[in-house]
C-alpha cells in the first residue's frame, strides 16, 4: 500500500457500484496480490501492472525493508461512498490509526473478557476499529453475517449468543435496534458508540431506559482523520441536553 497504489483483497461490495471501480482505474496503478497461483492465470489482458505471487506472509525483518517504517507512513486508504460526488480516497497514517486505537482503549478499558461486534461494511471507516481494536488487549472479535447490521432481531440474537459487550451504530439503526431490543438478551453490552448522524435527546433517553447499565458514547470524525476526532459520554441525568460532539480525543 502506498500513495500511488490501491491494494484490494477479497471482493468489492455490489453496493459500491461502478463509480468507485472507475475512479480506482483512473487514479491508481493496479496491483494484484495473489497468495497461490493456479497453473494458468489470465493476466495479460487484465490491466494489472504487477502481480505479486508466492510471497512469504511471515514477519518482515527490519533488515529486509527498503526504508525504515515511520509513524507518518500510510496505514490504509478508505474510499467514501461518493454520495456527494466522486468517491475519494481518505489516506490515514500509522500514527493516526494507532492514536485512535489507544484512545478507544483509554475510554473503554477493554479486557480479554470483552467481545466486540464487527458488523460495519468494510467500505466505512468504523469497520477499521471494529476489527483492529480487539488486537490491543486481546479481546474477542465477533463477526456478524453480511447485512446482519440491518436486522435488529438478528442483532439481539447474536449479542445474547456471543455475549457482545461493545458495538457501534448510526443513530437511525440504533433507534431500530432499541425499538426491538430485548433487555434480557442485551445484558452483556457495556459500551454503545454512535456516529455518522446527530444523536437526539429522545433516542438517548430510550437507550438508557432499555439498557440502563450501558455506557453511551457520541463520537464524531471524518474518514480523513482516522475515524473519530471528538467524543462525548452521555449521562442518564442529562435528559434535556442534546448530546454535543464533545471534546478532542
Regions found by a protein language model. Name each.
Residues 79, 127, 172:
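Short alpha-helical segment within the catalytic ATP-binding CA
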Residues 101:
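Short-chain dehydrogenase/reductase
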Amino acid at each position: 500500500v502506498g500513495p500511488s497504489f490501491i491494494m484490494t483483497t477479497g471482493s468489492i461490495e455490489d453496493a459500491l457500484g461502478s463509480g468507485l471501480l472507475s475512479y480506482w482505474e483512473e487514479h491508481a496503478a493496479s496491483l494484484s496480490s495473489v497468495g497461490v497461483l493456479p497453473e494458468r492465470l489470465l493476466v495479460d489482458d487484465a490491466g494489472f501492472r504487477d502481480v505479486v505471487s508466492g510471497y512469504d506472509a511471515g514477519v518482515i525483518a527490519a533488515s529486509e525493508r527498503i526504508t525504515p517504517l515511520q509513524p507518518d507512513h500510510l496505514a490504509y486508504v478508505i474510499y467514501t461512498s461518493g454520495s456527494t460526488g466522486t468517491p475519494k480516497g481518505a489516506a490515514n497514517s500509522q500514527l493516526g490509526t494507532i492514536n485512535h486505537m489507544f484512545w478507544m482503549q483509554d475510554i473503554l478499558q477493554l479486557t480479554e473478557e470483552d467481545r466486540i461486534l464487527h458488523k460495519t461494511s468494510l467500505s466505512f471507516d468504523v469497520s477499521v476499529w471494529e476489527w483492529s481494536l480487539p488486537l490491543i488487549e486481546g479481546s474477542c472479535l465477533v463477526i456478524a453475517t453480511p447485512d446482519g447490521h440491518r436486522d435488529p432481531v438478528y442483532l439481539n440474537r447474536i449479542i445474547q449468543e456471543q455475549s457482545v459487550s461493545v458495538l457501534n451504530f448510526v443513530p437511525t439503526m440504533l433507534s431500530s435496534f432499541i425499538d426491538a431490543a430485548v433487555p434480557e438478551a442485551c445484558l452483556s453490552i457495556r459500551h454503545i458508540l454512535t456516529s455518522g448522524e446527530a444523536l437526539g435527546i429522545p433516542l438517548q433517553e430510550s437507550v438508557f431506559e432499555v439498557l440502563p447499565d450501558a455506557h453511551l458514547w457520541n463520537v464524531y470524525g471524518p474518514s480523513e482523520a482516522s475515524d473519530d476526532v471528538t467524543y462525548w459520554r452521555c449521562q442518564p441525568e442529562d435528559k434535556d441536553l442534546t448530546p454535543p460532539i464533545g471534546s478532542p480525543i
